[in-house]
C-alpha cells in the first residue's frame, strides 16, 4: 500500500528523497532521506521502471542540499555570542506549506511530517556535528530562526537569570534609580553584571526598603535578568567580589536560576525582622515599653495604604500580622523595638499610626505621638508566610 501510494504521488510530483520519505515520516526508523531513497529503489525493482531523484524538488526546491551553507549562516549570525546550547526554527513560504498539505489531502497521507520539522532537525544535526554545539529544546542559549528561501537567519539570544541576596550597608540609597539620587542598589549591582555578561541588566528586588533604611543580616532576595548576553561563561564569585568592594552594597549566594524560579522568588512574601528606634514626644517609661510589646505581640494590624505612597499604591486596607516583639528603653524619649512581621507591613506607620490609617499602632497604644527615627531590616526570613 505504501509503495502504491508513493508511485501515485511520484507520477504527479517531482519530489526529492527527503520530501518523498517525509510523506511516510511517522513509519519505521531512519531519516526521511533514507526512507525516500529506499521507497524509490523498491519501486524501481517492483515495476522495472527507474524512479530517479529529480535535479530540483518541486516542493523544497533543494534546500536540504544546502544544510552546510545554512549552518554557516547560523554560526555567522551568532558571531561574538558565547553559547553552548541551541535550537533551530524555520519559516518556509506559505505556498510551500500549503502545497505540502494539498499533497497530504489528495493522496490521503496520514503518516507525514511537516517540512519545517525535518528541516529544523536536520540543520540542527549539522550544527551539532560541525560546530560542537548541543541542541536543546528547553531553554537553549540561542535560537536560530532560518528562512531557507531568502537565506536569512534571525538570532534569538535567550536571557540569563541570576538570583541572590543583597545587603544595603548605608542609608540614603534607593533600591532603583530615582530623581535626586546619583546611584541606586540596582545601578551598583547591574554595573558589574553588565561588565561581565556584556548584556542589558534588569534588576528586580523581592520587596523594597525605604531610602533611609538599611538592609542587613541575610539580605533581601533579588533577581537579575541579563538580556541578550554576549558572554555566558561567567564566574559569579567574581561579580560578588566586585560589587562587595563598593562598601555600600554587598551581594551573597549568587546562582543561576530558571525563569520559573525567578517568578517564585519575586512573588513569595517572607516574614521580616526589623529593628526600630522610636521617639516619643511626651516621653516614655519602661512600663510603657512593656505595654507596647504586650499589645503588639501576635497582633493583627489593619493598615490602610500609607499616605506617603498613595501616589503609587492602591488605597486599600490590608491585614498583616506582628509575630514577635522585643522592646528596650534607651532614654526618657527613645526606645528600641525589634519586630518579626509579615512582609508588606509598613513599620514606620505601625509606629506613628499615620493619622489613624494603621491600627493598632505604637502611638495608639501609648496615647502619645510617636514616630520612627531609625529603621533597619535585620533579616528576610526563609520561611514562607503561613508556614509553622
From Swiss-Prot:
Stretches assigned to the THUMP domain: 35-159
Taxonomy, superkingdom: Archaea
Keyword annotations of the record: Isomerase, RNA-binding, tRNA processing
Binding site for substrate: 274, 346
SUPFAM superfamilies found in the cross-reference section: Pseudouridine synthase (SSF55120)
Any one GO BP annotation for this protein: tRNA pseudouridine synthesis
Alphabetical list of InterPro entries matching this protein: PsdUridine_synth_cat_dom_sf, Pus10, Pus10-like, Pus10-like_C, Pus10_THUMP_arc, THUMP_dom
UniProt EC number: 5.4.99.25
Reaction(s) catalysed (UniProt annotation): uridine(54) in tRNA = pseudouridine(54) in tRNA; uridine(55) in tRNA = pseudouridine(55) in tRNA
GO MF terms, alphabetically ordered: pseudouridine synthase activity; tRNA binding; tRNA pseudouridine(55) synthase activity
Keyword Cytoplasm: no
The UniProt record lists the keyword Transferase: no
Pfam families listed in its UniProt record: Pus10_C, Pus10_THUMP_arc
Active site: 210 (nucleophile)
Temperature dependence: Optimum temperature is 70 degrees Celsius.
Enzyme kind, highest EC tier: isomerase
Family of this protein: Belongs to the pseudouridine synthase Pus10 family.
Function: Responsible for synthesis of pseudouridine from uracil-54 and uracil-55 in the psi GC loop of transfer RNAs.
Name of the protein in question: tRNA pseudouridine synthase Pus10
Species: Pyrococcus furiosus (strain ATCC 43587 / DSM 3638 / JCM 8422 / Vc1)
Lineage of the species this protein comes from: Archaea, Methanobacteriati, Methanobacteriota, Thermococci, Thermococcales
Gene that this sequence comes from: pus10
Amino acid at each position: 500500500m505504501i509503495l502504491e501510494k508513493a508511485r501515485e504521488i511520484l507520477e504527479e510530483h517531482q519530489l526529492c528523497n527527503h520530501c518523498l520519505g517525509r510523506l511516510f515520516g511517522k513509519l519505521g526508523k531512519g531519516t526521511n532521506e533514507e526512507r525516500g531513497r529506499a521507497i524509490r529503489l523498491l519501486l524501481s525493482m517492483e515495476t522495472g521502471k527507474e524512479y530517479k531523484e529529480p535535479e530540483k524538488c518541486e516542493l523544497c526546491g533543494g534546500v536540504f542540499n544546502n544544510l552546510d551553507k545554512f549552518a554557516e549562516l547560523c554560526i555567522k549570525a551568532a558571531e561574538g555570542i558565547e553559547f553552548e546550547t541551541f535550537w533551530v526554527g524555520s519559516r518556509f513560504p506559505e505556498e510551500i506549506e500549503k502545497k505540502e498539505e494539498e499533497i497530504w489531502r489528495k493522496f490521503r497521507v496520514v503518516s507525514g511530517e511537516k517540512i519545517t520539522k525535518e528541516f529544523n532537525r536536520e540543520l540542527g544535526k549539522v550544527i551539532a556535528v560541525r560546530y560542537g554545539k548541543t541542541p536543546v529544546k528547553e531553554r537553549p542559549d540561542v535560537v536560530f530562526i532560518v528562512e531557507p528561501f531568502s537565506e536569512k537567519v534571525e538570532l534569538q539570544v535567550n536571557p540569563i537569570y541570576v538570583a541572590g541576596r543583597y545587603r544595603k550597608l548605608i542609608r540614603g540609597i534607593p533600591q532603583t534609580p530615582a530623581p535626586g539620587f546619583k546611584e541606586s542598589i540596582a545601578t551598583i549591582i547591574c554595573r558589574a553584571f553588565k561588565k561581565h555578561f556584556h548584556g542589558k541588566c534588569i534588576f528586580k528586588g523581592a520587596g523594597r526598603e525605604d531610602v533611609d533604611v538599611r538592609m542587613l543580616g541575610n539580605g533581601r532576595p533579588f533577581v537579575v535578568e541579563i538580556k541578550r548576553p554576549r558572554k555566558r561563561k561567567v564566574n559569579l564569585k567574581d561579580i560578588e567580589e566586585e560589587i562587595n568592594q563598593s562598601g555600600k552594597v554587598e551581594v551573597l549566594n549568587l546562582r543561576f536560576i530558571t525563569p520559573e524560579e525567578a517568578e517564585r522568588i519575586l512573588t513569595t512574601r517572607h516574614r521580616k525582622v526589623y529593628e526600630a528606634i522610636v521617639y516619643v514626644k511626651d516621653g516614655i517609661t519602661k512600663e510603657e515599653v512593656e505595654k507596647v510589646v504586650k499589645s503588639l505581640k501576635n497582633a493583627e494590624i489593619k493598615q490602610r495604604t500609607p499616605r506617603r505612597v498613595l501616589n503609587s499604591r492602591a488605597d486599600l486596607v490590608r491585614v498583616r500580622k506582628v509575630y514577635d516583639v522585643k522592646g528596650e528603653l534607651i532614654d526618657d524619649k527613645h526606645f528600641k523595638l525589634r519586630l518579626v512581621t509579615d512582609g508588606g507591613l509598613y513599620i514606620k506607620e505601625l509606629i506613628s499610626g499615620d493619622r489613624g490609617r494603621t491600627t493598632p499602632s505604637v502611638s495608639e497604644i501609648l496615647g502619645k505621638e510617636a514616630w520612627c527615627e531609625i529603621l533597619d531590616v535585620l533579616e528576610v526570613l526563609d520561611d514562607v508566610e503561613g508556614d509553622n
